[in-house]
C-alpha cells in the first residue's frame, strides 16, 4: 500500500472544501476539471463539476497518510466541547493489545446521553448536522428535524472522531455500504485495510467489518483508525469467537462485554438480531433456504438449544443504555430475511419486521439512533411491498437493504442481479444499500470484487437519487452527456464513476491520443456515428433557420423596426 494518495486519486480531480459557520467545519468535495467546448465562435469554458467525496484526507495533498498512525481526529473538538463526555483511564474491557494507536476511549458522563438524536430532539444543530447539510446541499434545520424524528441517522460514535459525518435517510442521497473483513480461512489485517481504502475510493459511504477469523479486535482497530466513513459490525460474530465458536455457549455477559469493547473502539453502528424470537423460528421450517443470515442462524441455534427467548430481545433495554453512552446507532438485523426468491415476503420475514418496529420505539425512548435492515432475495414485483411495510411498521426509520437480488440464477453476477433490485428499492425510499460483489454465495471478495460491487451499487444509488429528484443529482449526468455529444472523450471518462475502466475500454481499439477528440468511437466509426450526424443536422437546421430569417427580413422591407 505504498503511495496511498496515488492509489486513491482520480484523473483531473482535486480536493476542495466548503467551509461552514465555523473554521473547523470543512466539507470535502471532489472537483472535476473539464475542457472547453469548441464552437464556431471560439472556445467556451465549461465549469468544473463538484461531486460527493468519500475518500477522506487521503486525497488531500497536504495530508501524509500512514496506516500505523491513522487519520486525524476531525470531530474530537466538537465532541469534547459539548461538555457531556469523559475520558476513561483505560478500556473497561480487559483485552491484550499491542497496537500502535495511542488513545483513551470516551464515554458519556453519568446521566448524560451523547447521541445525535438526543441533541436534535432538543433543538440543537450540531457541527455534525451542519456538515451533512452542506454535503447534501440541504438546510441544516431539515437535517435536525429528520434526525429528531428518527427518519434519518448520523452514525458517529464519539470514539471514531476520524470519520467525516454522513447521513442515512430517505430525504437524502441514497448511501451504499461495503462489507469487508476476514474469514476463518482467508485474509490479513493489511488486506482488510487495503479493501477499506479501495471501497471508499470507489464511493462506499460506510463499511462493515464482518471479520470472523483471527485477530478480530486488531483488524477492527486498524480499520476504524484509518476510516473516514462510519464503520459497522455484527457483534455476535466476535462474541461467538470468544466462546470457541459454539452458539450454545453464548451468554448475555459475553455479548455485553463485546458491545462495550466495540463501542469503546469506535464502531459507529451495530447490527443486532433482536427480532429473531423463539416462536418465529418454526416459521422457517418449510422454507426453500431456511435461515440465511449468519447472525440470525446463530441466535436461532441458541434459542432452540436452551428453549429460551432470544437474549438480545430480553436485554434490549440494556443494549440501548450501553450504546447511548457512545452514540452507537443500532441497525436492527433481519435475521429471518429470505435467502431465495421462493421465500420472499413470507410469514417469518414479516413477523420479525413487526418486532423490529416495537424495538425501534424502545430505542427511540433512549434517544438511540436506529435503522432497519431488509432483504435479501425479492422478485421485482414484490419489492415495493417491503418498503411500504417497513415505513409503516417501523415508524419511518431508515431502511437498509441487502440488494435485494431479483433472481437466483446468476452466481458470479450477483452484483448485477442485486443492483437491479437496489435501484428499484432505493427509488421507493430505501436509505442505504448494502453492496453485493460478484463473489456473493461463492467466496470471500478480493480487491477487484470490492471495486465491482461498489461501482454497481453507486450506479443503483445514483439512479434512485435521479428517480427521487434529489437536488443536484442530475448535474453530473448532464455534464457527462454534454461531453459525450461534444466528443470531449477525456471529460467523459473523468466524469464517470470508474474513469479507468471507461478509458481502458475506449483505448482497446482506439488508443491514439488523436482518438480522444475524434467524432466517433470504434462501435460506429466515422460514417455511422449518430451524434456526429446530429451535429450536422443541427448545423443545417441553424443554417436553414438563418436563411428563413434573412428572407423574412427582405419580405418586411429590410427594416429592423415595424
Swiss-Prot record:
Gene Ontology process terms (BP): thiamine biosynthetic process; thiamine diphosphate biosynthetic process
Keywords for this protein: 4Fe-4S, Iron, Iron-sulfur, Lyase, Metal-binding, S-adenosyl-L-methionine, Thiamine biosynthesis, Zinc
Binding sites annotated in the UniProt record for Zn(2+): 377, 441
EC class (word): lyase
Cofactor note: Binds 1 [4Fe-4S] cluster per subunit. The cluster is coordinated with 3 cysteines and an exchangeable S-adenosyl-L-methionine.
GO cellular component, one term: cytosol
Pfam families: ThiC-associated (PF13667), ThiC_Rad_SAM (PF01964)
Biological pathway: Cofactor biosynthesis; thiamine diphosphate biosynthesis
EC numbers on record: 4.1.99.17
Annotated catalysed reactions: 5-amino-1-(5-phospho-beta-D-ribosyl)imidazole + S-adenosyl-L-methionine = 4-amino-2-methyl-5-(phosphooxymethyl)pyrimidine + CO + 5'-deoxyadenosine + formate + L-methionine + 3 H(+)
Cofactor(s) listed: [4Fe-4S] cluster
Function: Catalyzes the synthesis of the hydroxymethylpyrimidine phosphate (HMP-P) moiety of thiamine from aminoimidazole ribotide (AIR) in a radical S-adenosyl-L-methionine (SAM)-dependent reaction.
NCBIfam families (UniProt xref): PRK09284.1, PRK13352.1, thiC
Name recorded for this polypeptide: Phosphomethylpyrimidine synthase
Species of provenance: Geobacillus kaustophilus (strain HTA426)
Source organism phylogeny: Bacteria, Bacillati, Bacillota, Bacilli, Bacillales
Amino acid at each position: 500500500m505504498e503511495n496511498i494518495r496515488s492509489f486513491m486519486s482520480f484523473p483531473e480531480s482535486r480536493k476542495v472544501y466548503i467551509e461552514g459557520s465555523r473554521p473547523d467545519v470543512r466539507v470535502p468535495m471532489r472537483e472535476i476539471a473539464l475542457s472547453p467546448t469548441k464552437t464556431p465562435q471560439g472556445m467556451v469554458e465549461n465549469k468544473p463539476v463538484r461531486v460527493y467525496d468519500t475518500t477522506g484526507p487521503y486525497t488531500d495533498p497536504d495530508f501524509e497518510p500512514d496506516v500505523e498512525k491513522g487519520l486525524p481526529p476531525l470531530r474530537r473538538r466538537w465532541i469534547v466541547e459539548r461538555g457531556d463526555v469523559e475520558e476513561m483511564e483505560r478500556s473497561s474491557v480487559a483485552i491484550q493489545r499491542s497496537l500502535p494507536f495511542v488513545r483513551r476511549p470516551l464515554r458519556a458522563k453519568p446521566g448524560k446521553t451523547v447521541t445525535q438524536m438526543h441533541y436534535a430532539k432538543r433543538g440543537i444543530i450540531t457541527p455534525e448536522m451542519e456538515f451533512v447539510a452542506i454535503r447534501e446541499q440541504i438546510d441544516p434545520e431539515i437535517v435536525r428535524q429528520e434526525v429528531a424524528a428518527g427518519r434519518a441517522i448520523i452514525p458517529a460514535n464519539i470514539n471514531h472522531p476520524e470519520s467525516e459525518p454522513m447521513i442515512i435517510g430517505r430525504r437524502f442521497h441514497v448511501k451504499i455500504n461495503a462489507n469487508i473483513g476476514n474469514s476463518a480461512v482467508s485474509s490479513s489485517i493489511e488486506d482488510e485495510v487495503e479493501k477499506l481504502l479501495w471501497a471508499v475510493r470507489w464511493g462506499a459511504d460506510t463499511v462493515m467489518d464482518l471479520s470472523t477469523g483471527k485477530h478480530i479486535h486488531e483488524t477492527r482497530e486498524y480499520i476504524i483508525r484509518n476510516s473516514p466513513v462510519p464503520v459497522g459490525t455484527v457483534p455476535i460474530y466476535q462474541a461467538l469467537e470468544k466462546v470457541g465458536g459454539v452458539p450454545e455457549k453464548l451468554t448475555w455477559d459475553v455479548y455485553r462485554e463485546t458491545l462495550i469493547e466495540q463501542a469503546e473502539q469506535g464502531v459507529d453502528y451495530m447490527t443486532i438480531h433482536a427480532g429473531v424470537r423463539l416462536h418465529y423460528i418454526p416459521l422457517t421450517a418449510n422454507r426453500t433456504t431456511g435461515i440465511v443470515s449468519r447472525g440470525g442462524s446463530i441466535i436461532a441455534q441458541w434459542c432452540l438449544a436452551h428453549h429460551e427467548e432470544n437474549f438480545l430481545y430480553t436485554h434490549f433495554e440494556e443494549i440501548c443504555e450501553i450504546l447511548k453512552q457512545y452514540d452507537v446507532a443500532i441497525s436492527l438485523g433481519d435475521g429471518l430475511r429470505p435467502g431465495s426468491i421462493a421465500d420472499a415476503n413470507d410469514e417469518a420475514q414479516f413477523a420479525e419486521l413487526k418486532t423490529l418496529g416495537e424495538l425501534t420505539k424502545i430505542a427511540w425512548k433512549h434517544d438511540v439512533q436506529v435503522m432497519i435492515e431488509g432483504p435479501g432475495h425479492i422478485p421485482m414485483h414484490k419489492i415495493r411491498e417491503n418498503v411500504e411495510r417497513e415505513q409503516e411498521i417501523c415508524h419511518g426509520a431508515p431502511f437498509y437493504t441487502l440488494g435485494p437480488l431479483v433472481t437466483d440464477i446468476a452466481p458470479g453476477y450477483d452484483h448485477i442481479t442485486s443492483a437491479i433490485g437496489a435501484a428499484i428499492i432505493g427509488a421507493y425510499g430505501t436509505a442505504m444499500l448494502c453492496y453485493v460483489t460478484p463473489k456473493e454465495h461463492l467466496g470471500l471478495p478480493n480487491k477487484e470484487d470490492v471495486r465491482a460491487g461498489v461501482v454497481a451499487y453507486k450506479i443503483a444509488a445514483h439512479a434512485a437519487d435521479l428517480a427521487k429528484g434529489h437536488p443536484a443529482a442530475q448535474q453530473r449526468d448532464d455534464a457527462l452527456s454534454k461531453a459525450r455529444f461534444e466528443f470531449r472523450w477525456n471529460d467523459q471518462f473523468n466524469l464517470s464513476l470508474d474513469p479507468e475502466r471507461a478509458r481502458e475500454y475506449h483505448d482497446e481499439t482506439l488508443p491514439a491520443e488523436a482518438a480522444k477528440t475524434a467524432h466517433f468511437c470504434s462501435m460506429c466509426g466515422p460514417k455511422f456515428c449518430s451524434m456526429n450526424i446530429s451535429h450536422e443536422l443541427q448545423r443545417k437546421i441553424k443554417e436553414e433557420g438563418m436563411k428563413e430569417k434573412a428572407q423574412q427580413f427582405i419580405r418586411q422591407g429590410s427594416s429592423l423596426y415595424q
